[in-house]
Amino acid sequence: AFVIAAADIDLAAGKPQAAALRLRALLDVNPGNHPLTMAYANALLRNGRPKDAQRVLVEHSRRKPDDPQVWYELAETHGLAGSIIDVHRARAEYFILNGALDLAERQLGYALDLARSDFHTTASVQARIADIREMREEIKL
């Protein structure tokens, strides 16, 4: 908690690089720590490194796939990194975790529209849409 507070002070003082370095050092000895990882990604964003923050949060989403806050932050980070298809995919995961299946499916529809020329992404998005429809059917039972 102290390191995160110190990093917050660095950020408030306009020293995002110092905050990122401080948090990275502690993550090296506490890999996968949720609060440290989220704070580190934020420090990277504030340091103008959205692609690095994106990489950190994508990896973290694999460790914490059921955490809506991770998906929310990841969607925002994808946007800042210019990965618009991934914005919609991350938003969909956020909505799924919050029980908003219609909104999730809509987000995946947007992703599908953007991914038409990418077979792998299209197939993956279509599979997730099928998952949502299956979830909806299970709810009706």
What spans do the regions from the language model cover?
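Alpha-helical linker/edge segments of TPR/alpha-solenoid repeat scaffolds
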Residues: 50, 80-90, 130-141
